């Protein structure tokens, strides 16, 4: 039995949802109350929720205290505790596999030149891991053994995004991707369960044509997994626990985004959806039995659980609105029994 945990606030009683087709413009309508920019800034927000390795705590980003800082809350419910206190923006929290550290990124005065920080969830000790004002580092992702952090690198004067790996034991950096192509973006590094390779997405066309690559962590040799003719988008969202398949999203074929399983050895895709809505792949469950994907339908985002063995999918019984699986590396607990989502 799988349960779901939401990061949204307590919902009001169900209300009738207006059919968008029935909405008509009224130029003569009066605005009873103006929503000011100041009030918009006062809106409380919660995001970036992610499980602790033992499933007992959820880390998340919130501006409840005025700035986007890191908070912790018991997964069974309770009062949240502010873990970091900073005037700088913080985002993308991710737990180390042993639960001793949480990696996150923070910039300086909103300049979007991000550094990677570590904070101890027990003591609150903060360490600036990269400390490079002229280089932006984003999307930190722990290796399964917790020794390495893969992340995206972009020098301030460059338009190229590359992937580096930081060795927390030796305290040195290895460049996994390099090149000279202008505007190349290597993004979303995803570790295999054995830590031997990383799957990433490369975009050289500003959103119209992209590919999925696999890079060997030791040799830094990259292999193209999605060779194709024409301009189509292929992006990776997760690697199966057995390391044999990649969950991808692509508009190949009819131009609509759909979800498929890419066989790494044969470079063949088994499509899971063939829909006219915008479908996005998300994550495998740790036991390899399920995966999640989302569907944007009539302005609502529905979250689906797909059983790999049977090929059957069903929408999770969530409130109408925008729902998506949370978690920087996985929305599932390690035992695959609980699913974290945002609403």
Region locations from a protein language model:
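Short loop/turn segments that connect beta-strands within beta-propeller blades
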Residues: 74-78, 120-124, 167-171, 216-220, ...
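Blade/loop signatures of beta-propeller domains
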Residues: 14-35
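Short flexible coil/turn linkers enriched for glycine and charged/polar residues
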Residues: 77, 110, 123, 157-158, ...
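Conserved beta-propeller blade repeats
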Residues: 42-61, 87-106, 116, 132-155, ...
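Signal peptide processing junction and immediate N-terminal pro/mature segment
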Residues: 2-15
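Beta-propeller domains
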Residues: 60-83
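Structural motif
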Residues: 67-71, 111-117, 158-164, 207-213, ...
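A short beta-strand motif characteristic of beta-propeller blades
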Residues: 35-40, 79-84, 125-131, 172-179, ...
